[in-house]
C-alpha cells in the first residue's frame, strides 16, 4: 500500500514537470532577432525581473528560474542572471512577466512584492535589437518589449498592482 501511494505521488509530481523549449520552433530555418530579458539589481537581496516566459505557447527557460538556480544556497544575497532569446522574424504571441525576486522566499513575506504577467503581440523587424523592459513601483508593476536603440515600446504594456500595500 505504501509503495503504491509513493508511486502515485511520484507520478503526480513528475506529470507537473514541463520541459523548456527554444523560442523558435524546432523546424524554423529562417532569420532570427534577439530579445534580451532584464534582471536589474535593486539591492544585495532584491532584483527586478522583466522576462519572456512563453513564445506562441512554448515554455522558455526564464531569467527568474536561471537567477533562482544560480543563487541556491547563497542565503541573503542574489546575483542577477539575464537570458536572451532568438525569435523568428514573424509575428508572435509573447507571455511577459514583471516580478520582484528576493534572495530568500521568506524576505517576500515582510517586504514589498509585485508580479504581473500577460500576453502581447510582437512583430520583430530585421536588424533591430530588443529587450524586455518594465517598471516596478508602489503604484504599478508593468512589462513590455522595447527597441534598445530608441527605447521605444514595440508591444502593448502589461500592467498590474504595484508594490504598495
Residue ranges, per PLM feature:
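Short loop/turn and low-complexity linker motifs enriched in small/turn-promoting residues
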Residues: 17-122, 129-165
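Sec-dependent bacterial lipoprotein signal peptides
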Residues: 1-19
